[in-house]
Amino acid sequence: ASLSGSVSFFAVPAEEYIDADKRARLRKEGIGFPASGKSELIRLGEFDHSDIIMTTHVHMMPVEEDFYLGNAACNGFSAERVTVRGKAAHAAIDPWDGVNALSITSSAIQMMGLMRETFREEDHVRLHNVIRKAGDVINAVPDEAVIETKVRAASLDAIRATQEKMDRAYDGAAYAFGGTIEREPLQGYMPILHRGADKVMEESVKLLDASYRCSKPADFNNACTDVGDLTHLFPVLNFTFGGFAGKLHGADFKIMDEELAYIKPAKLLALTTYRLLCDQAKEAKKICREFKPV
């Protein structure tokens, strides 16, 4: 049967959020890559002629079935590069004349820890700080510290509110010690919007010798992915699959079932595409009509 439509394949770089220093080096080399693969493709306009996006990944949540159909809601995040300015002094002769940037940083991070009781469970807040620099020599009061921060939460409102708390922690610690704070906002990801299993995908998976379950509104993934950016612009038909063992991003990760990890996901993509585009793309057009960009 003829199909009404076309399919584009993207070899997209992994969604992993690379550090600010590496992004700065890439920019100097003329490589855009502001945060991750799909975000960059959006920036370049590569999806401008697309109507529906299909994505797939190994299971990101505990799932016993072979396939998980639909998009569970996921956190989004904001990020900053924070530079703490202090004042250098000899660490033994006159430390009282210095302003310790590392102490400011440590105090701010401790304050964030004490703030955790203010985070609502339904907001799924996660805070991350990585100290990239905290002084240069051991016998001098550190006059500069550089930290990359990340705030994860389930909604933009929760992200903004938590980011304000994090900023106040740094500002308050700097004020207490007599230092200053500089901030560079970094690109983050939008939260993933929940989408249930589309009929075309559920009908397709039934043709495979595989177990499955469909996403529910209560399902939530605390991680973040650049698919979140796509879900605000396009209907994203997603599924995840098993066939592996070990931890995601762990040294023990390995494929255990090549049929389930490679062959069946490819078949599910092909079968779903067929059902979207057959019969004058009836199902694809219905999905597009019902989708409202956010």
Language-model features: locations:
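Histidine/acidic-residue-rich, glycine-tolerant segments that coordinate divalent metal ions
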Residues: 3-128, 135-140
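Metal-dependent amide/peptide-bond hydrolase catalytic core
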Residues: 106-294
